């Protein structure tokens, strides 16, 4: 049995496990991995816009389970590809099984919170031969650039959903990139927010200007409208005709 662990500069582990069969018969092995959290964090804040607990993507579908849900009953899912793990507000631990291998994941509470998976189809190793299983393990802070980089370079589907962008994902994520770009230019988040506010004001200036013009026109005709109302207060039809 041989285990090889590689670690890049962004804390993605590549774990390769090699088994050599020195017996006279074939053996079946089921690759398996498990992570454990001993207790719920003291400062956990499960707002509806921020999830802390179990998380995973199974066949393109994001699943999020709270610690309370897992304490009540274990949650089992099967998938042909995806990833699974435990997330905090700023940190994340996730398993990424080999792509294309059907696996069963289990979230459960048993002397601690556990997230594990097992490959459903065994790896058959014939006599005098060897077999290899590979696993990726992410243990790091949830930095947008790092997460997006792994999602693309490592072909990890929807790995960017590790970061909870909320219901308005299509808007909040691009907005983050704009603020981040302005921060890199200015070196200060306060300045970046001010610059973003100015930019938004400039973008919507034509619309606001049109609104102000309409209000000014309404103010200009207000005296005449009041005069007509007073003049034709007893004749609604005539008032409507004059106003038109």
Go through the PLM ranges and name each one.
Residues 17, 202-244:
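Membrane-interface amphipathic helices and adjacent TM-edge segments
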């Amino acid at each position: 049995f041989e285990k090889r662990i590689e670690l890049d500069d962004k804390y993605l582990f590549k774990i390769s496990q090699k088994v050599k069969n020195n017996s006279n018969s074939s053996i079946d092995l089921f690759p398996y991995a498990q992570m454990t959290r001993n207790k719920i964090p003291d400062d956990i804040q499960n707002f509806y816009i921020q999830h802390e607990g179990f998380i995973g993507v199974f066949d393109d579908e994001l699943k999020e389970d709270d610690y309370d849900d897992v304490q009540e009953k274990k949650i089992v899912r099967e998938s042909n590809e995806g990833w699974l793990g435990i997330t905090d507000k700023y940190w994340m631990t996730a398993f990424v099984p080999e792509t294309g291998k059907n696996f069963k994941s289990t979230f459960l509470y048993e002397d601690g919170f556990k997230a594990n998976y097992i490959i459903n189809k065994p790896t058959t190793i014939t006599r005098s031969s060897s077999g290899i299983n590979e696993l990726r393990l992410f243990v790091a802070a949830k930095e947008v650039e790092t997460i997006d980089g792994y999602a693309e370079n490592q072909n990890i589907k929807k790995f960017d959903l590790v970061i909870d962008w909320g219901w308005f994902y299509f808007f909040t994520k691009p907005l983050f990139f704009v603020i981040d770009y302005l921060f890199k230019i200015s070196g200060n988040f306060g300045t970046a927010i001010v610059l973003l506010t100015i930019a938004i004001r400039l973008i919507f200036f034509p619309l606001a200007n049109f609104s102000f013009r309409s209000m000014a026109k309404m103010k200009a005709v207000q005296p005449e409208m009041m005069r007509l109302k007073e003049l034709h207060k007893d004749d609604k039809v005539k008032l409507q005709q004059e106003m038109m």
